[in-house]
Structures are given as C-alpha cells and as structure tokens.
Amino acid sequence: MASTADFKNGLVLQIDGQLWQIVEFQHVKPGKGPAFVRTKLKNVVSGKVVDKTYNAGVKVETATVDRRDATYLYRDGSDFVFMDSEDYEQHPLPESLVGRAADFLLESMPVQIAFHDGVPLYLELPVTVELLVASTEPGLQGDRSSAGTKPATMETGAEIQVPLFINTGDKLKVDSRDGSYLGRVNA
C-alpha cells in the first residue's frame, strides 16, 4: 500500500485486478476544499490511458514490479528475444509487448524488462539511442515553405524527421520515447 504522497512517474498500481502505470501526476491544493492528486494512468497490458483523481492521503495498492537488466539478442518471427543480464535466461517477448520500441532496437542493446509475478509487462529502452541513417533525400535550402526538416529512414527501419543537413550514413542521437531527432554523434 502507498499513499498519494508516494506517487511518482513509473509507479505501478493495482486497481480492480489490473495493473496501471502512473504516466503523469499533479498534486493540487485548491483555495477552498481538500487537496487532491490528478493522475494519468496507462494500463500496462492494453496501453489504454485514463485520467483518475484521488483525494490527498488516500492509500492505494501498489504492484510489485521487478525491473531486470537485459540485452536484445535477435528477432525470431514475431518475437523479440532478450537475454537476462544476471542469470543469462532468454526471454522471447511478443511484438505486441515490445510495441514502438521495436523501431529503435539494435542487437546487443541494453534494455530493462519489467516483470510482475514472473510475467513480462513492458520494455524500457535507454532514453537516447544512436542510429545510422540508412537513407534520406538530399535537402536543398530553397526547397521548403516550412521548417527545415525531411524524413530519414534509420538502420532499424524507423522513419524520423531530421534537419536538412543530415545525409545518408550519418550517426544520430534519437529519443526512443517519441522518435525525435536530438543531434549528431561526433565521430
């Protein structure tokens, strides 16, 4: 059990037999009335996001989530195979569980897998990943009417928006949470 004062992003709650992860939370102290906590919760299994409000100080049931370090090995059909860094056990995770993270996975990449009662719940990638640009069109300075970006296909197959000066073969830092360009990697 945890109080609303213990809320933090990433905390997993057990509500009506389902697991919900706190994506955002905000403590609100209005001028009149009692304080409350506004949360945005994501269902760990389905990915559905809901808003829920709790009175301040309310006790909620938390789920025990074990985060284990692992390494991405290879793709086997629709499964992604990871090796636990502690006991070297291999864990095949279905494509539905890996989700958008599949766009940024490289072989031998360190990741974290969250387990609840021995069942994998979700995958956490490093916030920034370094990827090579597999292909992109040459960007010309005068050929745009808006911001200077163009699509680029990365070595993993992900397509992201990059500045016009990026060329095929460049190594880039990419935010794995939203697929945004962060910068070039200096060689």
From Swiss-Prot:
Coiled-coil region(s) at which residues? Answer: none
The record's GO molecular-function terms, alphabetically, read:
translation elongation factor activity
GO CC terms, sorted: cytoplasm
Pathway, per record: Protein biosynthesis; polypeptide chain elongation
Task: Name the keywords, alphabetized.
Answer: Cytoplasm, Elongation factor, Protein biosynthesis
The GO annotation for biological process reads: peptide biosynthetic process
Q: Where in the cell is it found?
A: Cytoplasm
Q: Which Pfam families match?
A: EFP (PF01132), EFP_N (PF08207), Elong-fact-P_C (PF09285)
Per the record, the major location class is cytoplasm
What InterPro entries has UniProt attached to this entry? Elong-fact-P_C, NA-bd_OB-fold, Rib_uL2_dom2, Transl_elong_fac_P/YeiP, Transl_elong_KOW-like, Transl_elong_P/YeiP_cen, Transl_elong_P/YeiP_CS, Transl_elongation_fac_P
Family (UniProt): Belongs to the elongation factor P family.
What is the annotated role of this protein in its UniProt record?
Answer: Involved in peptide bond synthesis. Stimulates efficient translation and peptide-bond synthesis on native or reconstituted 70S ribosomes in vitro. Probably functions indirectly by altering the affinity of the ribosome for aminoacyl-tRNA, thus increasing their reactivity as acceptors for peptidyl transferase.
Q: Mind telling me what this protein is named?
A: Elongation factor P
- Identify the species of origin: Mycobacterium sp. (strain KMS)
Traced from the root, the source organism's taxonomic lineage reads: Bacteria, Bacillati, Actinomycetota, Actinomycetes, Mycobacteriales
